[in-house]
């Protein structure tokens, strides 16, 4: 059924830009209700979380006692991943910091990564993608006119981290992902990045190159690394009293970290996609999800969030320069970029995908394996 009336949650700021949103009799949406019922149990809970964290750290140290590193840590130059590095080092872990370089990093992000690694005294490895392949693949998603423009990055990151972990005999990957800043994100806004059939279908239709070196991470790869190699993710920030504002202060004062703008704007393409392409073309404003999470976590008031949403998601004075930069990186003309952006919006459903199979697979997995808060996927 097509929704014909606009509605916004009375507690958070999620609205009918999520086609799957629902509301209870009090006007609260399914997202903030789910946060209360589920996510609040998966965030910091005082001494209980501390005890669980102590057990996790002991397990990581024990598993890596005979290796140079006891964990791999993905870093992007953003707040969450840099603070996760700070937390890991403070807890006595020996991480190998790994950055997946897709060619779109801002200068600020690169400096942040190097400063954090140097000041914490941890080894840092940059995994550089083949730019020609990656550029062609990401341009294919842009031409496909779907919201999942960042799927190539989203799938390359876990692929890279798992490969590096396996190469170094490491069993744990530390992630900066957390429920305080990312507890709410509508599934309708971004289709499953692990659907390799979907990725390959997009590339076959719109791409010009064969993907010979691009690292994918589909369900079979995930099963291999998880069940055969025994590699697990650990979300440290869910076990500490994590405040993004306090984390920023800490990083700035102790590690020379510099702010780069909005959430995930450490990447030039992510900034362009999330602040301009998604809101303008698809009516998707990621700020709503971020602010709604922060409201539910008690870190932002709804009034402040609504005030922020009154501002444009992109800088009108800078957008022309951003478009020129993106077109140049993709090696297309500004006119070609404008034509692509103006093409009708489409959905993953318009292309071959494995949604039905993945649904069965994930349901089976949940039945067989008991979900654990500390170590997932």
Model region roles, listed by residue range:
Residues 79-82, 334:
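Short flanking/linker segments adjacent to small metal-binding domains or redox-active Cys/His motifs
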Residues 1-71, 87-377:
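Nucleotide-activated chemistry modules centered on ATP-dependent adenylation/adenylyltransferase
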């Amino acid at each position: 059924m097509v929704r014909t009336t606009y509605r916004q949650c009375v507690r958070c700021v999620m609205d009918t830009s999520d086609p799957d949103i629902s509301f209870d009799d009090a006007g609260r949406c399914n997202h903030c209700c789910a946060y209360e019922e589920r996510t609040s149990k998966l965030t910091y809970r005082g001494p209980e979380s501390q005890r669980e964290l102590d057990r996790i750290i002991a397990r990581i140290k024990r598993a890596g006692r005979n290796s140079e590193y006891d964990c791999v840590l993905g870093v992007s130059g953003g707040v969450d991943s840099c603070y996760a590095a700070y937390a890991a080092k403070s807890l006595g872990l020996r991480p190998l910091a790994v950055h997946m370089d897709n060619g779109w990093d801002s200068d600020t992000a690169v400096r942040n990564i190097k400063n954090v690694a140097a000041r914490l005294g941890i080894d840092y490895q940059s995994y550089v993608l083949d730019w020609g392949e990656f550029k062609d693949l990401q341009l294919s998603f842009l031409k496909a006119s779907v919201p999942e423009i960042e799927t190539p990055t989203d799938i390359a990151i876990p692929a890279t981290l798992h490969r590096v972990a396996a190469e170094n005999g490491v069993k744990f990957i530390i992630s900066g992902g957390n429920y305080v800043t990312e507890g709410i994100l509508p599934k309708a806004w971004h289709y499953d990045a692990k659907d390799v059939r979907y990725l390959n279908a997009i590339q076959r239709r719109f791409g010009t190159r064969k993907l010979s070196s691009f690292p994918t991470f589909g369900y079979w790869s995930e099963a291999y690394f998880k069940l055969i190699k025994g590699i697990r993710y650990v979300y440290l920030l869910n076990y500490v009293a994590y405040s993004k504002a306090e984390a920023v202060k800490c990083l700035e004062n102790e590690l020379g970290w510099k702010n780069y703008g909005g959430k995930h704007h450490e990447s030039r393409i992510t900034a362009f996609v999330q602040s301009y392409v998604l809101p303008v073309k698809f009516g998707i404003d990621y700020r709503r999800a971020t602010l709604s999470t922060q409201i539910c976590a008690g870190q932002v008031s709804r009034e402040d969030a609504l005030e922020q949403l009154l501002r444009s998601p992109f800088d009108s004075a800078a957008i022309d320069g951003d478009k020129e930069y993106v077109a140049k990186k993709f090696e297309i003309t500004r006119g070609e970029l404008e034509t692509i952006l103006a093409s009708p919006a489409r959905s993953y459903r318009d292309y071959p995908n494995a949604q039905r199979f993945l649904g069965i697979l994930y349901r089976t997995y949940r039945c067989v394996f008991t979900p654990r808060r500390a170590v997932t996927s």
